[in-house]
Amino acid sequence: MVLIRVIANLLILQVSYAQKSSELVVGGDECDINEHPFLAFLYSHGYFCGLTLINQEWVLTAAHCDRRFMRIYLGIHARSVANDDEVIRYPKEKFICPNKNMSDEKDKDIMLIRLNRPVKNSTHIAPISLPSNPPSVGSVCRVMGWGSITIPNDTYPDVPHCANINLVNDTVCRGAYKRFPAKSRTLCAGVLQGGKDTCVGDSGGPLICNGTFQGIVSWGGKVCARPRKPALYTKVFDYLPWIQSIIAGNKTATCPP
């Protein structure tokens, strides 16, 4: 596993500059090693994303993180040194909304993945519950991931970084982005004065509001952490019926329009 990690880290450094600046944690600090047992790391030939473990067999991420080959690390903190309970899994099944507009990666940016083998709860592996209610504007939200921690030049940390941001009204994001979709099941979150944001490498990771899993890192501005440029997160609550149907075995379930 050590050799795999060394090769993976070198590849990440080689290609990470080519990733879009819509996926990083800027303005944060190293996450506590015990605060993210639900956070997973997706790696594919130098490309990487975050994921969220929602039960022993299923993870959620962004649809635009989909790749042909994916290795999923659970129980991970430092990419260079494995935790004792760290495990690797692969997708057994992948589900993207069948009614998604595939020409628009912002549309229905959610993917449900069934792991090839279930994981067991341990010190650094445990699922987080799906939301029972949507979050309220003003909520304090936590973002986390292995994305770049500097702008405009990218610097990728060995360990995940965390930052607190705020859930703001959708009108802020609609005013900030000219191409904001007319129908968007997203959450708008950030720090209006700038300085903290998600961006390159954090796509697919969780948005935790008041301790509840509410969003999936989706997209944002070309340059991260700019004033009045919050990022967009897929609103997990709106997709609960689809998620629950797929897990229950209804593989033809569709997402809300």
Curated annotation (Swiss-Prot):
It is found in: Secreted. One of its GO terms (biological process) is proteolysis. Residues 25-248 form the Peptidase S1 domain. Its EC number is 3.4.21.-. It comes from the Eukaryota. Residues 19-24 form a propeptide. Expressed by the venom gland. GO terms for cellular component: extracellular region; secretory granule. The record marks D197 as: Required for specificity. The keyword Chaperone does not apply. Its main location: secreted. Residues 1-18 form the signal peptide. Disulfide bonds join C31-C162, C49-C65, C97-C255, C141-C209, C173-C188, C199-C224. This is Snake venom serine protease BITS01A. It comes from Bothrops insularis (Golden lancehead).
